[in-house]
Design a protein with these regions (language model features):
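C-terminal catalytic "cap/lid" subdomain
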Residues: 1-242
Length: 242
């Protein structure tokens, strides 16, 4: 297809939706959706079952086994999705379904490389109305897509995905100059975005403390947890993400 990597997955899900299919099977070169990248972590293993939301979060935040949009048509028609290996079909795979709860609540880890962190800062933000709207209007004008966002009294930090320096090409002097008409701007590169994906992570006691204590030896930036019950994300220096 013309949809890029994983586009055939999305096409299959759209066809399943159009045909009112009960299930959609996606055959790849891996035996299901893994807990993390097995090339980095030998202990990684396929998950027997995932919810639509968990799979969508994993695809969005770096898991390459599925196209991020694949879950949309499946979710609309409640179509079960199976992911397995065409080379080793006897090994089974992962079923992706509407409702799925497993222990522990954190179930997988993804990584998205080449992230850019932008921090905009001005004392005027404390009392000004519409400041964020101005900032994100400039970002949208230059066709930049924001992922994580954190705020303080006088500053806002946000991340931009930067595959093959595509963001660097658009986050140019013109963009920064326009932002600097309303605030100070700091651009930092060399980060990877790590996301822990699971279910009911907001309500499970001690989940965030366990995750953060496991990475306490590393300098984390932009810890984001709470907007979605299925993930906790943070930036880490690209030299530490493995």
């Amino acid at each position: 297809t013309t949809l890029g990597r994983g586009g055939s997955d999305f096409t299959a899900a759209l066809l399943a939706e159009a045909l009112d299919a009960e299930s959609c099977e996606i055959w790849t070169d891996v035996t299901g959706v893994y807990t993390t990248d097995p090339r980095i972590t030998p202990a990684a293993h396929p998950l027997p079952e995932l919810s639509f939301e968990e799979a969508a979060e994993m695809a969005t935040f770096g898991a390459k086994v599925l196209h991020p949009a694949t879950m949309e048509p499946a979710l609309r028609k409640d179509i079960k999705v199976f992911v397995g290996s065409s080379k080793e079909p006897e090994k089974g795979g992962t079923w992706i379904v509407r409702d799925c709860e497993h222990e522990p609540p954190y179930r997988a880890i993804t990584r998205r490389k080449e992230q850019v962190m932008v921090t905009v800062k001005t004392p005027k933000m404390m009392y000004a109305q519409g400041f964020l709207q101005q900032v994100f209007a400039i970002i949208a004008k230059h066709k930049l897509s924001v992922d994580l966002v954190t705020t303080s009294e006088i500053s806002v930090s946000f991340t931009l995905d930067n595959p093959a320096n595509s963001v660097a090409q658009r986050l140019n002097k013109e963009t920064i100059a326009e932002l600097e008409t309303i605030c100070d701007v700091k651009v930092e590169k060399g980060y990877d975005l790590v996301t822990v994906v699971g279910n009911n992570m907001q309500t499970a006691i001690g989940v965030s403390s366990k995750i953060l204590s496991a990475v306490s030896d590393f300098n984390l930036r932009m810890i984001c947890f709470g907007a979605n019950p299925h993930n906790l994300s943070f930036l880490v220096n690209e030299t530490d993400s493995d």
